């Protein structure tokens, strides 16, 4: 009986994890950002890899990430940046020697949302299950 119960619990966890991935992501920006939407995945990747540092109006882009252990960040890294966490860490190590720092990290989707609401020029990502209140949705990632 115990192995069967364990199998059922494991299946439920996998289904829930899969549904979180299936939700997709919203790429959100501070309401002050004036940019043609939707942004392409290439543009978003360039922002997060610090290849684009300013918005079209000349204001600074301030990208914000989830913590490295977040499922939302894993989905973003694999889907948008097309890298795994190890490759991305190696990329940031290289840029560190050029004096560049990775994006700011927030511990929850609500914290990302609050950061983007309050920091001019900021851009972040949240799952589609979070209401994007007070921000501009600049792209949707399936």
Residue locations for each model-derived region?
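Cleavable N-terminal signal peptides
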Residues: 9-10, 20
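Bacterial N-terminal signal peptides that target proteins for export
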Residues: 1-8
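Sec/Tat signal peptide C-region and signal peptidase I cleavage site
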Residues: 16-22
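Exported/periplasmic ABC-transporter solute-binding proteins
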Residues: 23-142
């Amino acid at each position: 009986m115990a192995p069967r119960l364990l199998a059922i619990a494991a299946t439920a966890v996998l289904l829930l994890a899969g549904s979180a991935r299936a939700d997709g992501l919203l790429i959100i920006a501070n309401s002050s950002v004036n940019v043609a939407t939707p942004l392409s995945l290439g543009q978003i990747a360039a922002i997060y890899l610090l290849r684009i540092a300013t918005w079209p109006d000349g204001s600074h882009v301030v990208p914000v990430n989830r913590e490295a252990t977040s499922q939302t960040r894993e989905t973003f890294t694999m889907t948008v940046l097309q890298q795994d966490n190890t490759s991305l860490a190696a990329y940031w190590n290289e840029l560190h020697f050029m004096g560049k720092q990775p994006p700011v990290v927030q511990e929850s989707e609500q914290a990302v949302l609050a950061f983007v609401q309050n920091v001019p020029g900021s851009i972040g990502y949240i799952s589609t299950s979070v209401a994007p209140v007070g921000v501009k949705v600049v792209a949707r990632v399936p």
